[in-house]
Amino acid sequence: MCIRDRDKVKLVNGSQFKELYNEQLANQGDDPFDYTGWDANTDWQDEIFQTAFITNNNISITGASPKHSFYLGVGYSYEQGNIEHEKFSKVTINASNDYKITDFLKVGFQFNGARMLPADSKQVLNALRATPIAPVYNNEYGLYTALPEFQKAQISNPMVDVELKANTTKAENYRASGNIYGEVDFLKHFTFKAMFSMDYASNNGRTYTPIVKVYDAAVNGGISTLGTGKTEVSQFKENETKVQSDYLLTYTNSFDNGNHNLTATAGFTTYYNSLSRLDGARKQGVGLVIPDNPDKWFVSIGDAATATNGSTQWERST
């Protein structure tokens, strides 16, 4: 999958931007901007987008007899995002079984499970807002370039997020859901069905904030540090459970040789939902930079004096 020109947002180029910006400054009565060093013609969308690869693989087994049906499927998906370094993968398993024990009794179950590694997603917005007159990279300093004075307080070079902060979030999501049911026919016209369903999700993630330096001709030495200038690690863990039970009684009958049909259904449902989430973060200690190594991205490695934390939890039922 690739981003074609027709799919990109149409923006002005470097010379067109200068023309429009000059008009804005003149209308505001402001001094003209000094474009020295700002003569690039950067297409930021071309810089951040990539030709992406997608694969989906599935295999399944099915079986059936007059009294029994069975299904088992396993799948694997891998996707690269339109933005460089973004990638997503998922493994799934699905199973179902229905069995007719007697002419009046049927039981079955269904199960769906998944393990997902979400993408460390980045934004396109900065690439749409960043001025095209800014160069991407300064070869002399070996650093990405800060944006001009009129922009750098609001946004940074889009490549900072895409390249320097690539793969700084590691997350795992697990999901398991399913149901079991039993259905019985009795007294010729009645059917009673009971179903119990459960949905369980467990998500966890870690995010690393690196020290980011960019080339900025407006500062002494030409090197500027973005943000706090300290490394940081944050973590979260979230578990959610949903349980539901449904009970249905159905009456069906025909009258007048089938010219009139009657179906009546009554039932009730119970529902339970619980969630528990913990969040924590720590910055580096004095002179103790947290390594850019996922094996070290745990809050216990940071300075306890800088710790922040939070939590969310609830239980609900109907």
Language model regions located:
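Periplasmic plug
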Residues: 71-73, 108-109
